[in-house]
Each structure stands twice: as structure tokens, then as C-alpha cells.
Amino acid sequence: MQLFHLCLIISCSCPTVQASKLCLGWLWGMDIDPYKEFGATVELLSFLPSDFFPSVRDLLDTASALYREALESPEHCSPHHTALRQAILCWGELMTLATWVGVNLEDPASRDLVVSYVNTNMGLKFRQLLWFHISCLTFGRETVIEYLVSFGVWIRTPPAYRPPNAPILSTLPETTVVRRRGRSPRRRTPSPRRRRSQSPRRRRSQSRESQC
């Protein structure tokens, strides 16, 4: 398996720090968190169950449909675009290597072990990474982090003391458990109309009438 890791490092041409984190940090057990610079952590992502994340194929289709022009552009758009570019490239290289191993590895048991490892371990990490950056581009990074915190609070709360349904990212601003810091906008409630004060002339006439 170490040889598999080494082949992946060699075949995955990753010129940026973000991609180096992806390849080296996860594979060699280095204490490198690819989400920290974006305000999140691997632990925060781990609160979401594995079946929460769409398949890599669906995520790649989503990224292509929404951000293809920006991803293919030679310009620097944002750190999320850069991370997506490198993740997509690394996934392509990983699939190429997995195909090569599947063709050239004669032992069926070893071949199945490699395929299972890629799908179970690397596949989940790529699904998490792709989902995170696509969601940050779609909903905003602060909203996504807020959602991860809210889901973490929800999942760790005993069922008897939490809402029946988990938070939903697309409706987070209305249903979030954890609100952004800062003053919340005050709602203006319609105040009852004040009775217009009577003019001095009117009050004087009334006082004269009362004296008569």
C-alpha cells in the first residue's frame, strides 16, 4: 500500500501548496488540514455522515455546470477555484493510476483491495473536499462554516432536546442554530398613531367655553 501511495504522489503533478496538502497530508499522516486556511477543519467536516456527500461524478458535473468557465480560465479567481482545480486534476490522476493498477495487478484479491481503498478512503475525502469548495462558491464560505457548526451542534444534541430535522444548507439563514456574531437588525413594529395635540387657539376656545 505504501507503493500505491508513492505512485500517487509521483503521478499527481501538484504545483500548489493546496494540492500538496491534499496529496501529502492525507496519505502520509502529516498534521496538515486542507480546510484550516478556509476557516474549517477536517473534524468539522466529519460531523456530516458519509452518505451526505454526493458521488464524485455528481460533484464534478456540478462544478463543470456552474464554474466551468472560471475553472478553465488562466486567471486566478479565488482560493476555492484553485483548490477545485487541483482536486479535479488529482482525482483524474488517481483514476488513471487505479485503472493502471486494475489492469496490471494480476492478483484479484489485491486488485479488489486497491479499488476498495480508493473508493472508501480517498473517494470520501475527495467528495468532502469537492462539496466544501463548491458549496463555498455557491452559498458563501461563512454560510457553509455556519452550517457545519450548526450541524455539529445538532448531531451531538440528544434526540429528545433537538429539532427532528437536521439543518439544511440552502435554508440556513432562516433556520440556523448558530447565528452570526453582531447585532441583529431590529424589526420596526408599527407604533400606534399619536393623537394630534390640539392647537393653543383650540385649547383657549375650549377653556373660555368652560368658563361661560
UniProtKB/Swiss-Prot annotation:
Homodimerizes. Changing residue 188 to G: No effect on cleavage. Residues 165-212 are annotated as: Disordered. GO terms for cellular component: extracellular region; host cell; host cell cytoplasm; host cell nucleus; T=4 icosahedral viral capsid. Changing residue 201 to G: No effect on cleavage. It is found in: Secreted; Host nucleus. Gene3D superfamilies: Viral capsid, core domain supefamily, Hepatitis B virus (1.10.4090.10). Residues 178-205 have a biased composition (Basic residues). Residues 184-212 form a propeptide. Its main location: secreted. InterPro entries: Hepatitis_B_virus_capsid_N, Hepatitis_core, Viral_capsid_core_dom_sf_HBV. Residues 25-27 are annotated as: HBEAG. The lineage of its organism: Viruses, Riboviria, Pararnavirae, Artverviricota, Revtraviricetes. Residues 184-206 are annotated as: 3 X 8 AA repeats of S-P-R-R-R-R-S-Q. One of its GO terms (molecular function) is RNA binding. Pfam families: Hep_core_N, Hepatitis_core. The gene is C. This is External core antigen. It comes from Hepatitis B virus genotype D subtype ayw (isolate France/Tiollais/1979) (HBV-D). Keywords: Disulfide bond, Host nucleus, Host-virus interaction, Repeat, Secreted, Signal, Viral immunoevasion. May regulate immune response to the intracellular capsid in acting as a T-cell tolerogen, by having an immunoregulatory effect which prevents destruction of infected cells by cytotoxic T-cells. This immune regulation may predispose to chronicity during perinatal infections and prevent severe liver injury during adult infections. Phosphorylated. Cleaved by host furin. Belongs to the orthohepadnavirus precore antigen family.
